[in-house]
Design a protein with these regions (language model features):
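Periplasm-facing N-terminal accessory domains of Gram-negative outer-membrane beta-barrel systems
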Residues: 18-108
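Cleavable N-terminal targeting peptides that direct proteins into the secretory/outer-membrane pathway or into
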Residues: 1-21
Length: 109
């Protein structure tokens, strides 16, 4: 019984240690009005991870490996915003807010 308990403890703590990364959180608003923007995609370039802002414009990206990253927003009708040199540390939450401006998208005639 003790052997099984030890093995479970090692597996549990081992997976926590190896899975730990940092977090990125923030809020996305419309620049002119200051209103939150729901559904904005925030991507960590080169990592294949990201999140969408919620109904309050808030987002959180978890399990980000430590390092320096570029974040990019994507939302129809709004200009893309890029933030470079965002530092993420293990066990810490890096804060980054975005203010998006509307962009006219012209279609073909």
């Amino acid at each position: 019984m003790n052997t099984i308990l030890r093995m479970l403890t090692i597996l549990l703590f081992g997976s926590i240690i190896f899975a730990e990364g940092g977090k990125i959180s923030g809020i996305v608003v419309e620049k002119d009005s200051g209103e939150p923007l729901p559904g904005v995609s925030i991507l960590v370039e080169g990592e294949g991870i990201g999140a969408d802002s919620d109904v309050n414009g808030q987002f959180i990206i978890i399990n980000v490996p430590p390092g320096t990253f570029t974040l990019k927003t994507s939302y129809i009708g709004y200009a893309t915003v890029k933030v470079t040199d965002l530092i993420v540390n293990i066990g810490r939450t890096s804060k980054q807010d975005f203010a998006l401006t509307q962009e006219v998208i012209e279609g073909e005639t």
